Amino acid sequence: MAENGAAEGTAQQPQVQMNILGQFIRDLSFENVMAQKGVGGEVQPDVNVQVALDAKKRSTENQYEVITKLNIESKNKAGGEVLFVLELEYVGIFNIAGVPEDQLHPFLLIECPRMLFPFLRRIVSDISRDGGFPPLNLDNIDFVAIYRNELARRQAEAPAEVTN
């Protein structure tokens, strides 16, 4: 009897569906500072990667736009000179159905960027290589940690806004 109840409960839950309808580079900038300044010789890069995420509903039902912004700065460890700066804004258009409303926000800012990440990694690798540097292969990004940090930051700011 319990097996039937479990099967019925599973059948009632909506099936989550996610399709990537499109993905594209919205904005891309690469600046080879090292070449512009004529810096040469042996360098040891120190790479700093900053990630920002955003999502918004589109006018079509169940469609969302998810934006991943990367700001990457590579500096020489020895002198601190900037070697290159790469800024990338990458967008995915998703059709999402069956996700409960209270879980949609984390789904958009965790699962969708996770699906786009291999493409971002490839673009960063190609651009850094084509810019005259060894290919920069990004480590995996923990989108769950980024989401939690952003929630904590917003909660910390909320009491400050109420008292002002």
Swiss-Prot record:
GO terms for cellular component: cytoplasm. It comes from the Bacteria. Keywords: Chaperone, Cytoplasm, Protein transport, Translocation, Transport. Its main location: cytoplasm. One of its GO terms (molecular function) is unfolded protein binding. InterPro entries: SecB, SecB-like_sf. Pfam families: SecB. It is found in: Cytoplasm. GO terms for biological process: protein folding; protein tetramerization; protein transport. HAMAP family: SecB. Belongs to the SecB family. Homotetramer, a dimer of dimers. One homotetramer interacts with 1 SecA dimer. NCBIfam families: PRK05751.1-3 (NF004392), secB (TIGR00809). One of the proteins required for the normal export of preproteins out of the cell cytoplasm. It is a molecular chaperone that binds to a subset of precursor proteins, maintaining them in a translocation-competent state. It also specifically binds to its receptor SecA. This is Protein-export protein SecB. It comes from Ruegeria sp. (strain TM1040).
